[in-house]
Amino acid sequence: FFAYCSFVDPHHPFDPPKPYGDMYDPDALDAPCRMEGELIDKPPHFRKALAARGFSNERYDYRKLTDHQWGQIKAAYYGMITLIDDNIGRILHALKEKGMEKDTLILFTNDHGELLGDHGLLFKGPFHYDCLIKAPMIIKWPGVVPQGSRYSQVTEHVDIMPTLLEYAGVRPPYGVQGCSMAPILRGDKGAGKEYAMTEFNCYDWGLSVKTLTGRDYKLTYYAGEGFGELYDRNQDPEEFRNLWEDESYGAVKAYMIKKLMDRIIETEDPLPLRIGKY
């Protein structure tokens, strides 16, 4: 059998039911990761988002939120995560009751993260910080995937389908862009990708965004715009300093743009499969 179980939460609006809304102390949680003035060298839509529209007709400025208020938001978000965890537990318990636990591959991941006050912003959008695009993944299959192992290789969501098909003994269909993660799970240290590409067409913002993330650098390209983003992930893991205009990183920027263009071409929609000689 195959079951795709998709949960909307955790997601705004942050309104978990009881008792989940009261599980976490807002004042005991870490303050958001941010630095005064960090958005000065970012593209203009970052600063525009500081006074974003909420889920009413009222506009508000995120800069006016206190650490306690950010903690309240994070506590609600954590409560929603616990709500989902508990219900995933119900699924796992049902598999165990039916004797299917050891013969079922379970893969858990998400589609994106949440700003939660990091960099002074909330929700999501065309801001490709790690807190939004670095998605965790848990894979469980007793006897096949080593329990308790951790892997740090670069992968993408498009790799999920080829991975499941390989474990099921099925050849991926023609034109699939992803690569199976099975070699990584078997312990191959050389497996994985050099870069991960993130795409976001934010038409209501008038932006088409593509980001290339590697171990050392991250580049974000905005189609038709003169601005962009470049981060040194080793020197600036919090992504506070945008190096797009830094001439000393010009060669890195050019190299990353070329790698991004290569990837865009590689992932174009495939032509129909050729079945004849001419």
Residues covered by each model-derived region:
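Active-site-proximal cap/lid insertion segments
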Residues: 1-154, 167-175, 221-224, 228, ...
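Hydrophobic alpha-helical membrane-association signature
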Residues: 84-87, 160, 256
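Solvent-exposed, non-membrane alpha-helical residues enriched in polar/charged side chains
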Residues: 89-92, 96, 182, 241, ...
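C-terminal cap/loop subdomain of S1 sulfatases and analogous C-terminal strand-loop tails that border
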Residues: 112-118, 145, 156-161, 166-233, ...
